[in-house]
């Protein structure tokens, strides 16, 4: 079977929401929502191999460390594993005083009763009950009319209120979800929720949570935002209700739908770290939080060591995080393109500490989430001098002069073309070392002695030429001019740069020289030494040897 030529014969577009006076498009997110992780429930139930108790405990502690204050930990009536995990959290005193656990139950008497048994002794808990409300579920799955759906919800709400009253030592919160909210008629969603409100009688001091799931994402994010704004206008006791969002990513816009839903007036978000969950996953709490962070709003969640969080999530879920996943993927802060690398390098060069972040192609400073800069620029056959220069600067403190950047990039390009692979900073440095720092043939500097008097420099050098020792002597207005005068070939210094590598007692000097031998194109050399004069001499010998070697190769 192939794709239909006319998909309208099989699929219908989602109907638009009649909300001509919608206000959310002109709003921005200025307040942090209440965050609730569903990793241990919605995320866990979507895994090929659900987490065992040890993994769930490890995950729970990670969520606490990140700063989650509401954590949906289990579906305790669904399995003994989930039930026992809730008991271990409570009896083992693993729940901090500022954290509230949440558990899910279907709207059935036996399951609700079992759920309350799991929570006995908890200091605080959210009981989350749900039933499906969408027309297709009413008709196909449950064979219920609208009143039947309302009765299921209100009967469950009454039982929850009764059982909570029997355990007064626990600080209870109630949550109701009209499952498949995003595909339910808005008027009916409000009708069901208002019926639950009438049972639970919330107040501004003791609010209930109405969770509005896009259980299956079936429209563009603006439609979900319209639904949230419409619902907020029409639900009873809005000041006593926390509107919660629970989006999925079936169309790839779960994050966008949630952000627009917050602009439309929602107060709370349920989701999973890195977007785990049924089918295409729940909304990614990390992306949401760091999107806020990069807009100057701290999400009150701490991802300062995002790779440590990822490690726990990957090992517990037994699912890898995609290398292109926002903020956390291995490649999200990486540039291979030469033009991108050049822009990033220039951005880092001008970026001042504590200033507004303006580095091109990087929406967040990787250091803020515990990343180093090594992976920001990586070199392959598409890379240019900017990326190569950046890696040498960041990893080895070597700042190549501009013309030398061009020269060395051709060396690297030749190697990447030959290998067809990415090159690491270490491999690039090895190339630099072999091309420049180990260029000690045919002339090898053994030792030198410098005398300076009345503005004149005299240098005596011991040099090995093709294995034979030679003595050179030169005089000039400075050490380099004296060295050039001592050379057995005619050479001209075209450019010279130097800088320190490191600081303090362990600092070394790096010198870069561009020379031109008579009848040849200019070439560069590098020298590194604790002494700046020695470094400059080594740089000149490096350039000299490269020039002589290339001339001989050309002649051959």
UniProtKB/Swiss-Prot annotation:
Known catalytic reactions: 3-methyl-2-oxobutanoate + acetyl-CoA + H2O = (2S)-2-isopropylmalate + CoA + H(+)
Swiss-Prot/TrEMBL cofactor(s): Mg(2+)
SMART domains given in the database record: LeuA_dimer (SM00917)
The protein's annotated pathway: Amino-acid biosynthesis; L-leucine biosynthesis; L-leucine from 3-methyl-2-oxobutanoate: step 1/4
Residues given in the record as Mg(2+) binding sites: 42, 246, 248, 282
InterPro entries: 2-isopropylmalate_synth_dimer, AIPM/Hcit_synth_CS, Aldolase_TIM, IPM_Synthase, LeuA-like_post-cat, LeuA_allosteric_dom_sf, LeuA_N_DRE-TIM, PYR_CT
GO terms (BP aspect): L-leucine biosynthetic process
The protein's Enzyme Commission number: 2.3.3.13
Regulatory domain, as annotated region: 439-556
Any GO MF annotation of the entry: magnesium ion binding
Quaternary structure and interacting proteins, as annotated: Homodimer.
Protein name as it appears in the record: 2-isopropylmalate synthase
Gene: leuA
